[in-house]
């Protein structure tokens, strides 16, 4: 994911493997989020990619020559085809760009401890299945299926972009993204996301740490400072005037912004275009718009 320019719709996530190697070309299979391709490519295009199969980020070119694909991110740690295909199946229709961003941030994560933590979370199929389908609230903001994923992605991207814009360091950008993505993950155990009566009604922040216990424990052993910074993004903020870590401040700010924009959009959802004010039943607030 390019924090500076995220509008390139040509980026795609693909499981790739070599089908056949010929004299001057190679035949590769690309299994993407929604479809598959078999392409003849110059050998240099796929240099460094495991021919047995792995996950990559690709950028498509409209040309039909042997240079039509550019590998923008080589995710060499992910070589389990079954795990990748399971992840693809979890993707709700219309959320493909979110999944690309979620994996694309690996292109910026160079700290090994943080990278291992993040991959451990992404490759937990049971956790991701719950996370992708959950609601962010019962009757407040993003209260639809997949709403938690949409809200968390908004917070992650906006917080990371603010950290980049204010030049607080590449590691802070990554912590802001991951902290924003996971700041509400404990909500999968709240009553409105539970299939049975086992769901609880309470503070989801406590459940953030329960859900992420194993990868957080490993992160603490490998990098106590990053553990502390990421934990500050996941914890309850009561009675604190400011955060010690800037990524946590950005996550908190962007969390509130995402909720507010959702309320604003919902208020105007069924209002005629010529109306410039509307009431949100979600938070009993009047909103105005400029056009």
Model-derived regions: residue spans:
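Structural detector for short beta-strands of small beta-barrel domains
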Residues: 2-23
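OB-fold (S1/OB) nucleic-acid-binding surfaces
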Residues: 20-41
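C-terminal membrane module of polytopic membrane proteins
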Residues: 258, 274-289
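OB-fold/S1-family single-stranded nucleic acid-binding modules
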Residues: 61-92
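Beta-strand secondary-structure signal
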Residues: 13-15, 29, 57-59
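Divalent metal-dependent catalytic cores for phosphoryl transfer on phosphate-bearing substrates
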Residues: 139, 144, 161-273
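Short nucleic-acid-contacting surface segments enriched for D/E, G, S/T with interspersed K/R
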Residues: 42-59
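Acidic/His-rich, divalent-metal-binding segments that scaffold phosphate/diphosphate chemistry
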Residues: 80-198
């Amino acid at each position: 994911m390019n924090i500076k320019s995220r509008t390139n719709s040509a980026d795609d996530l693909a499981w790739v493997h070599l089908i056949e190697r010929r004299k001057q070309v190679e035949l590769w299979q690309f299994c993407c989020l929604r479809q598959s391709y078999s392409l003849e490519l110059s050998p240099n295009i796929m240099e460094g990619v495991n021919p047995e199969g792995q996950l990559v980020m690709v950028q498509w070119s409209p040309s039909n020559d042997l240079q039509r694909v550019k590998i923008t991110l080589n995710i060499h740690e992910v070589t389990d085809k079954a795990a990748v295909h399971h992840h693809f199946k979890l993707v709700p229709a219309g959320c493909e760009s979110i999944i690309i961003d979620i994996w694309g941030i690996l292109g910026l994560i160079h700290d090994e401890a943080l990278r291992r933590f993040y991959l451990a979370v992404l490759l937990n199929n049971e956790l991701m299945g719950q996370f992708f389908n959950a609601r962010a609230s019962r009757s407040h903001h993003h209260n639809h299926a997949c709403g938690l994923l949409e809200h968390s992605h908004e917070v992650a991207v906006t917080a990371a972009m603010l950290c980049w814009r204010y030049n607080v360091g590449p590691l802070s950008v990554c912590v802001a993204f991951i902290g924003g993505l996971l700041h509400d993950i404990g909500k999968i155990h709240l009553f409105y996301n539970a299939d049975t009566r086992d769901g609880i009604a309470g503070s989801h922040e406590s459940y953030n740490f329960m859900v992420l216990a194993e990868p957080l424990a490993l992160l603490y052993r490998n990098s106590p400072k990053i553990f502390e910074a990421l934990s500050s993004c996941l914890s309850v903020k009561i009675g604190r005037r400011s955060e010690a870590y800037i990524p946590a401040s950005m996550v908190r700010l962007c969390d509130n912004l995402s909720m507010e924009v959702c309320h604003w959009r919902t208020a105007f959802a069924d209002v005629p275009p010529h109306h410039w004010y509307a009431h949100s039943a979600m938070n009993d607030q009047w909103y105005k718009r400029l056009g």
